[in-house]
């Protein structure tokens, strides 16, 4: 499952389900990002084990440490709409290009999707275990 998504392969993956729908939803969420300081919009979308799609966008704060990543909004939407486990995830930047979640968000996603959560990343399709080996677990 370590496919490269450079060039043509990226276009193939983006056209496949569930990725096509998730990327579209992440791009839609990204349009609502509140980024008056960095101007760096991020949108995220995920498929839930019951078939729902949840999404989120980043929300900045003048005190940068209080900024909420798009993944935080996504997890909040997950629980506000009934909970469940994430099965597939993608996030995009302001141009709609695929991004890798930051370290904090990888830990957050692991909590709500586990080791086998599928992620579409800049380096291909990956499991959460591949992008966050030895995740912290209580």
Please provide the spans of the model-predicted regions.
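Histidine- and/or cysteine-centered catalytic micro-motif in compact active-site loops
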Residues: 47-49, 58-59
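Short Gly/Pro-enriched turn/cap motifs at secondary-structure boundaries
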Residues: 34-37
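C-terminal binding/interaction regions
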Residues: 2-32, 81-138
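Compact, glycine-rich, soluble single-domain proteins
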Residues: 57-72
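Feature captures the catalytic cores and cofactor-binding loops of soluble hydro-lyases/lyases
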Residues: 72-81
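Short beta-strand scaffold segments in enzyme catalytic cores
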Residues: 39-48
């Amino acid at each position: 499952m370590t496919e490269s998504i450079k060039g043509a392969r990226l276009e193939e993956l983006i056209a496949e389900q569930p990725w096509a729908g998730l990327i579209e939803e992440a791009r839609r969420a990204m349009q609502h990002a509140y980024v008056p300081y960095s101007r760096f919009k991020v949108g995220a979308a995920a498929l839930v084990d019951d078939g729902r799609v949840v999404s989120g966008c980043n929300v900045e704060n003048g005190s940068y440490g209080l900024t909420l990543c798009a993944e935080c909004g996504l997890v909040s939407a997950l629980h506000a709409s009934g909970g469940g486990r994430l099965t597939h995830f993608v996030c995009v930047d302001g141009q709609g290009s695929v991004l890798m979640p930051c370290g904090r968000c990888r830990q957050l996603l692991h909590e709500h999707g586990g080791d086998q959560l599928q992620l579409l990343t800049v380096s291909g399709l990956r499991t959460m275990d591949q992008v966050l080996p030895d995740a912290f677990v209580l």
